Regions:
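Low-complexity, Pro/Thr/Ser/Gly/Ala-rich linker/spacer regions in secreted
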Residues: 19, 254-271
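Betabetaalpha-Me/HNH-type nuclease active-site subdomain
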Residues: 38-148
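Domain-level detector of nuclease and nuclease-like folds
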Residues: 96-103, 107-261
């Protein structure tokens, strides 16, 4: 048996917020089981966070990555047409309720949950102040949207159908992932069918439209920026920003981007590959198989690739892993355009 010896240098400057946040969740779960696991995790939040705090953090969460003096405005699309209602970006100092100022948009509109969120003021806490549901928006654009339900469309934001709302090509993925967060965080109080129109995905309560938006409009660095900041301020995260493929695993629909590279459908028989010993002994892992192994990728539980082997010598391989921190890893084995992911514990 040919051996491959690898020394992995662990980078101490890696960010571990996601690793720590999702630690203990079994990502081999699917459907309602994974939904429940994520719901339990994100239900822990900063109970003292107010609607006023949400206003104050907008200048950080919604900062324009291209211009740190500005915030991005949800539904906005044109900064040069002379119409401030359609602005995509605005000076951070221009917060308020007047023309050409921006305010806080509840993407899952306040009146739509059952029961609804009620009136809000700067002292409000709870669902009405949840910053994962709030975006900077031009005040007139916010009024134009109001409590209209989301509906599929194309192009820029505006009215579609019979009094419904399309958030715009740029923002539809953001909206979908926020709706998914709200449904996961607050359950049946925020059913997707209360905030959007269209067909349900199979026997689930998720709208096909939101699954399509999630799959076709990938996560941006702006969404990551919001998620990372809000974990510090609000103490939870939006899992569907961290990995849109979680939605596919839970509700089905079109395959969304798997940002961790570990949630793809496992279409190789689990008996085709054996990883041993597991837990590992002295950081040594053996992979045996009668099939050709095209690639072996090790991920930490933050979804970070720590080892990537391409065509690692025939079908029987011994891989030595040194200097890895103790913990769980996911090993993705690819063979003939198929893959399977298995857990490994490094002691």
């Amino acid at each position: 048996m040919k051996k491959i010896t690898l020394l992995l240098l662990f980078l101490t400057n890696l960010l571990f917020s996601q690793q720590a946040y999702y630690n203990g969740i079994d990502f081999t779960l699917t459907g309602e089981d994974l939904y429940n696991a994520l719901q339990q995790r994100i239900s822990n939040y900063n109970q003292n966070f107010t609607y006023g705090d949400a206003r104050d953090v907008l200048v950080f969460t919604d900062e324009n990555p291209s211009n740190p003096n500005n915030v991005l405005l949800v539904y906005g699309y044109n900064d040069t047409d002379g119409n401030c209602t359609t602005d995509r970006s605005r000076d951070k100092l221009d917060f308020g309720g007047l023309s050409c100022e921006y305010n806080r948009e509840h993407v899952f509109a306040r009146t739509l949950p059952v029961p609804d969120m009620g009136n809000v003021n700067n002292s409000t806490t709870g669902i009405g102040a949840d910053p994962n549901n709030l975006r900077a928006s031009d005040q007139q654009m916010n009024n134009n949207r109001g409590s209209k339900l989301f509906q599929n469309g194309s192009g820029t934001a505006g009215d579609v159908g019979s009094g419904n709302w399309y958030p715009g090509d740029e923002w539809k993925g953001d909206v979908a992932r926020m709706v998914m967060y709200m449904y996961t965080r607050y359950g049946d109080r925020c059913l997707p069918g209360l905030v959007g129109v269209g067909n349900l995905q199979g026997t689930t309560q998720m709208l096909q439209t939101f699954l399509e938006w999630n799959a076709t409009d990938p996560v941006t660095s702006y969404e990551d920026q919001r998620n990372n900041f809000l974990q510090g301020a609000y103490l939870n995260r939006n899992p569907f920003i961290d990995n849109p493929a979680l939605a596919t695993v839970i509700w089905g629909g079109p395959q969304a981007e798997d940002r961790w590279g570990i949630l793809s459908t496992q279409d190789i028989s689990a008996t085709s590959f054996v990883i041993y010993p597991n837990p590992s002994v002295n950081s040594e892992i053996s992979i045996t198989s009668t099939a050709t192994i095209d690639a072996v990728v090790f991920y930490d539980i933050n979804g970070k690739i720590v080892l990537d082997l391409i065509q690692p010598t025939k079908s029987n391989n011994t891989i030595y892993i040194a200097n890895l921190p103790q913990g769980f890893y996911l090993v993705k084995i690819s063979s003939e355009n198929k893959s399977i992911t298995k857990k490994v514990l490094v002691n």
